[in-house]
Amino acid sequence: MAKRRGQPLDGVLLLDKPVGLSSNHALQRAKRTLDAAKAGHTGTLDPFATGLLLCCMGRATKISGAMLNADKTYRATLQFGEETDSGDLTGNIVARAPEDFPGVEEANLREVLSRFQGSIEQIPPMYSALKRDGKPLYEYARAGIELERPPRRVMIYRIELLSFTGHQAEIDVACSKGTYIRTLAQDIGRALGCYAHLFALRRTQVGPFSLDRAVTLDALQAMTDPKAALLALNELPAGLLPAT
């Protein structure tokens, strides 16, 4: 029988996921660096996105359900003038504003953003991991098949304009589980009448955990003792771990 690889570590690593890696790839690199036997993450970030990825080791994987259901906070950059099939910069352009599009006026943008605060309905994107008949929607999308998706109600607790250039805007969004920031960007563009897609995304908070305490993969791999980056079980907020 093959020997089980890794050490039985327990704890949470707050990882600042770099651009270009899938969440699972980032998790596996962290797991190897820590030499952990068991690891899982608590919510996928797209490869183009960066920011807070909770990597749970050993018994800390028991918080995964709570963190999947937790509220999240993001910093998102919207690109105005073009809509893509995926809702982000990785997709194919499917609609464009006129060539003489002058950009968005700040007053209009602020007014539109205010409409998206509170309880809103979103239609999940085709490029998502939601399943239909056991198959992820993105597989249908890649085959050129568009399926009807019922809208889902989500909560936008805060949506704040951080910076603005006319053709791009950076916003801070605090939202409930199941919120698609790509869809939010697309819907904002449609409400403005000029189209938009998500140009960049950075997750800054998951439940009680903040990006402020996160470590990059490079920094983790450079540490003399990478295990020192783990939050121990007794450091986790009270009530997060289920009773044993």
Swiss-Prot record:
<dbReference type="Pfam" id="PF01509">
    <property type="entry name" value="TruB_N"/>
</dbReference>
<dbReference type="InterPro" id="IPR020103">
    <property type="entry name" value="PsdUridine_synth_cat_dom_sf"/>
</dbReference>
<dbReference type="InterPro" id="IPR014780">
    <property type="entry name" value="tRNA_psdUridine_synth_TruB"/>
</dbReference>
<dbReference type="GO" id="GO:0160148">
    <property type="term" value="F:tRNA pseudouridine(55) synthase activity"/>
</dbReference>
<dbReference type="GO" id="GO:0003723">
    <property type="term" value="F:RNA binding"/>
</dbReference>
<dbReference type="InterPro" id="IPR032819">
    <property type="entry name" value="TruB_C"/>
</dbReference>
<dbReference type="InterPro" id="IPR002501">
    <property type="entry name" value="PsdUridine_synth_N"/>
</dbReference>
<keyword id="KW-0819">tRNA processing</keyword>
<comment type="function">
    <text>Responsible for synthesis of pseudouridine from uracil-55 in the psi GC loop of transfer RNAs.</text>
</comment>
<dbReference type="GO" id="GO:0031119">
    <property type="term" value="P:tRNA pseudouridine synthesis"/>
</dbReference>
<comment type="similarity">
    <text>Belongs to the pseudouridine synthase TruB family. Type 1 subfamily.</text>
</comment>
<keyword id="KW-0413">Isomerase</keyword>
<feature type="active site" description="Nucleophile">
    <location>
        <position position="46"/>
    </location>
</feature>
<protein>
    <recommendedName>
        <fullName>tRNA pseudouridine synthase B</fullName>
        <ecNumber>5.4.99.25</ecNumber>
    </recommendedName>
</protein>
<dbReference type="GO" id="GO:1990481">
    <property type="term" value="P:mRNA pseudouridine synthesis"/>
</dbReference>
<dbReference type="Pfam" id="PF16198">
    <property type="entry name" value="TruB_C_2"/>
</dbReference>
